[in-house]
Regions:
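Extended N-terminal soluble domains of membrane/secretory-pathway proteins
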Residues: 1-138
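SNARE-motif-like long amphipathic alpha-helical rods in endomembrane trafficking proteins
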Residues: 120, 124-226
Length: 226
């Protein structure tokens, strides 16, 4: 099972390249809600928690790219199952950051790129997600990369996504969960109706049997008094 469910590289809110391995639409909606909240005034390495998902990202800053400030608006983001921890997702992020800058040098005009303007990188994203998310070798490479890049992933700030989003945005995130609950509720209602129908027929049969017994008793009494 893939434990890296969605990844993207964006310039501010413009998604340049993206890959989703999860059938759920919730993962991509998480990314679209997080990106507008990310500040690039200083470099950031941060994890947000949302249920069983963790949203990890590395946000560039113009201070890291003084000669190419456009690169300072980039965000490298991945959504992973919480069971994967943080070393593997951040190792993955450091690797895609390195490969992305190899394919698109810092001097590229990222601000002028349209949505999915770096879609040629999609295959690289998917390949790394599969490798780092499912293979022991890939996960070991990710951990080694994370150790090289950061001394201690526990130093990465972790926040709950609920504190980041406005109420309306939090409601948007419930849509996917509500759809699943709605399906379960419909199934429950169908089963409830079937159960009620069976109980009704059972009661009808019982009442019919009681009526027959009462009639037989009355008939017996009448015959005995003659």
């Amino acid at each position: 099972m893939l434990t890296l469910t969605s990844a993207c590289i964006a310039h501010h809110t413009t998604i340049l390249t993206e890959c989703t391995t999860s059938a759920s639409s919730q993962t991509s909606s998480l990314a679209s809600l997080i990106l507008p909240k990310i500040q690039h005034s200083t470099p950031q390495k941060l994890t947000y928690t949302h249920g069983t998902n963790h949203i990890h990202y590395i946000a560039e800053s113009p201070s890291e790219h003084p000669e190419h400030p456009s690169a300072g608006g980039l965000t490298f983001l991945v959504i992973a199952e919480s069971s994967l921890g943080r070393r593997i997702p951040f190792g993955f992020l450091f690797e895609i950051r390195k490969r992305f800058f190899e394919a698109f040098p810092e001097g590229s005009e990222f601000a002028d790129m349209p949505n999915y303007g770096a879609a040629s990188f999609n295959q690289d994203l998917r390949g790394l997600m599969v490798d780092y998310g499912t293979t022991a070798g890939g996960q070991n490479d990710a951990i080694s990369t994370a150790k090289r890049e950061i001394d201690d992933v526990r130093g990465i700030m972790t926040r709950n996504i609920e504190g980041l989003l406005e109420r309306g945005e939090r409601l948007d995130l419930l849509v996917d969960k509500t759809d699943r609950l709605g399906g379960s509720a419909r199934e429950f209602r169908v089963r409830s109706r079937d159960l009620k129908r069976r109980m009704w027929w059972k009661n009808v049969k019982l009442m019919g049997l009681l009526a027959v017994v009462v009639i037989l008793i009355i008939f017996t009494i009448v015959m005995a008094t003659k």
